[in-house]
Amino acid sequence: MRMSAPELIRIVSRDSPMALAQVERVRAELAALHPGVRTEVVPVRTTGDKWLGDLSQVEGKGAFTKEVDAALLSGEADLAVHCVKDVPADRPLPAGTVFAAFLKRDDVRDALVHPDGLTLDELPDGTRVGTSSVRRVAQLAATHPHLRCVPFRGNANRRLAKLAAGEADALLLAVSGLERIGRTDVISEVLSTETMMPPIGAGILALQCREGDRALIEAVSALGDPRTHREATAERMFLHVLQGHCNSPIAGHAQVDRSGELSLRACVFTPDGKVRLNAHEWAGRLDPATLGTSVAVALLRQGAREIIDGIAH
């Protein structure tokens, strides 16, 4: 027997412009599916948004989810919207909560933003590239060692403002994030996943509920995309088995092809980019979680544990 959807759904999210744009997508999809349901937004400022230093000094990736989770668990909100890449995979979700749906995946690629429209290969020696992502820093060090990465934290709008103020010469940002805030006009070049392997969970929004809210879970689960669910499951299990931390340069991309076959390509780097471990497997008869485990084990056999444990965090 189908349960009726709740009359009101309070949606909690980070209060950045990008996060609130993501909430509007969720509200629109809910309205299309359940026209009679009202929604309210509960914006919260997270530790990760307030702290612009090294994330390892606060709570790593959990710095972007702690306050959102607290609002959900306290009953202040009913539904949380997360970027999957910001949700720690080295630990379970907070007790009493579940992911009810993964929305259809957006673009996973990174973009270069340069005021004069230069491409990555056109950047001259010593160009200051703004990014605080250890994943991006390691890959740039490996392929473009003549560039200089400078720490750049803050939401996308803030980073664009800092670029305009001359604090860097170029920026690396997620294509999906620029799409969400309507700023694709600043993109100089979209980087292929071969040039810049994306982070785990790139371009995926997850809807999180309290596990006892069965009517709400049923109402929002229909927003989920089956292909994205398979990809997210493989990627998050991969990261869970690796037990990476926020200073670990780890990248990975699971993909369901047109025939429905799932594969996972992943890498672990040293921070200086001088060592890169690679693994790429097709699921075949394996379920997504088992594929993620298999790829992680393949990298562990190559020495990933020693690299990860050797990085301060």
UniProtKB/Swiss-Prot annotation:
Record PROSITE patterns: PORPHOBILINOGEN_DEAM
Reaction(s) the record says it catalyses: 4 porphobilinogen + H2O = hydroxymethylbilane + 4 NH4(+)
Location of S-(dipyrrolylmethanemethyl)cysteine modifications: C246
Domain of life: Bacteria
Keyword Lyase listed: no
Cofactor (UniProt): dipyrromethane
Additional remarks: The porphobilinogen subunits are added to the dipyrromethane group.
Function: Tetrapolymerization of the monopyrrole PBG into the hydroxymethylbilane pre-uroporphyrinogen in several discrete steps.
Matching HAMAP family: Porphobil_deam (MF_00260)
Subunit structure: Monomer.
Name of this chain's protein: Porphobilinogen deaminase 2
Source species: Streptomyces coelicolor (strain ATCC BAA-471 / A3(2) / M145)
Lineage, broadest ranks: Bacteria, Bacillati, Actinomycetota, Actinomycetes, Kitasatosporales
